[in-house]
Amino acid sequence: MSGGKKKSSFQITSVTTDYEGPGSPGASDSPVPPALAGPPPRLPNGDPNPDPGGRGTPRNGSPPPGAPASRFRVVKLPQGLGEPYRRGRWTCVDVYERDLEPPSFGRLLEGIRGASGGTGGRSLDSRLELASLGISTPIPQPGLSQGPTSWLRPPPTSPGPQARSFTGGLGQLAGPGKAKVETPPLSASPPQQRPPGPGTGDSAQTLPSLRVEVESGGSAAATPPLSRRRDGAVRLRMELVAPAETGKVPPTDSRPNSPALYFDASLVHKSPDPFGAAAAQSLSLARSMLAISGHLDSDDDSGSGSLVGIDNKIEQAMDLVKSHLMFAVREEVEVLKEQIRDLAERNAALEQENGLLRALASPEQLAQLPSSGLPRLGPSAPNGPSI
């Protein structure tokens, strides 16, 4: 098998001396010989399971030399542990492979936590707990066909905020039947919950009581995410439940994960206008503009927040340019006023000199001035021929 499906195999529980063919009647419902030493662990059907040291043949080993090869065949099993049956002189019980390599366990755990982020931590933790017994734990859905269920003894409870701690599995399997198991309600103090990851859409839910429902035909079990102490000897086997199996698409969070993608207009800090009429504030204005970018970038706002910051920078730059232009125009006006003042003084001096020259000139010289056609303020022309 590949992916999250389990490998199927069988386990030899006892060996008898008599031999019966594979097709003999009553081969599948014969009882298990009770000649076993020590208190063995219990199977779901109540029959004792011998310790690993009493097995006649290893799980994946080869049959004895004198046994026919047709006695062993691969059988596809439904979910749950099968009934003991006879194969010749072998009494066998179908079990599931739960061997998981330790190096790949961490990577598989991280992959499942990332893949099941939309369904919340509750279903993932319940699947991890019940997988220690090799039981499939898809997410419970309304309207799902219910198969035969088995009894589960509730785990021991301990006082305090952590109301339950699982040690070495969920409980001990008892006789078959159709039932559900409910543990007593939690104490008044709420249990400590694991904080949901950044990608989880559903937060962990706190239930007033723990309901565990295990079905051999593909039912579901759900537990709230309580803190657990797992035994080191227990090997977990996890199974991903596709949305097509459960008939319900897992809810997703429409909001993005990064908090920087949200923008609150009330968090934008608009700096006051640092410009004034005096020219001494221009240097401090330039320095404040250099510090604006660091001030706006320190906020967590992005997207529209950065656009508002850019608009503020543009407005401040335009105000700065306008103030510098006003300063330059004022300086040019002052320079032009000085030049006009100098020219006016020079013009007054020339008019005064011209008046003095007219007063000192002879009548003949004054008579030649209009005939020459020269302007009055121009330089003196050479004397023309007398009339």
Swiss-Prot record:
Alphabetic keyword roster: Cell projection, Cytoplasm, Nucleus, Phosphoprotein, Repressor, Synapse, Transcription, Transcription regulation
Tissue expr: Expressed in the liver (at protein level). Expressed in Purkinje cells and proliferating cerebellar granular neurons (at protein level). Expressed in the cortex, medulla and papilla of the kidney.
TM segment ranges: none
Pfam families noted in UniProt: TSC22
Modified residues (Phosphothreonine): 57, 183, 223
Compartments where found: Nucleus; Cytoplasm; Cell projection, Dendrite; Synapse
Modification type Phosphoserine: residues: 62, 165, 187, 189, 219, 254, 258, 271, 362
Cleaved signal peptide residues: none
Any single GO BP term: response to osmotic stress
GO CC terms of this entry: cytoplasm; dendrite; nucleus; synapse
Region feature Disordered, mapped onto this chain: 1-85, 135-232, 368-387
Other known facts: Involved in the development of hyperglycaemia and insulin resistance in diabetic mouse models. May be involved in altered hepatic lipid handling as part of cancer-induced cachexia.
PANTHER family documented for this protein: TSC22 DOMAIN FAMILY PROTEIN 4
Protein name (Swiss-Prot/TrEMBL): TSC22 domain family protein 4
Naturally occurring in which organism (per UniProt): Mus musculus (Mouse)
Gene: Tsc22d4
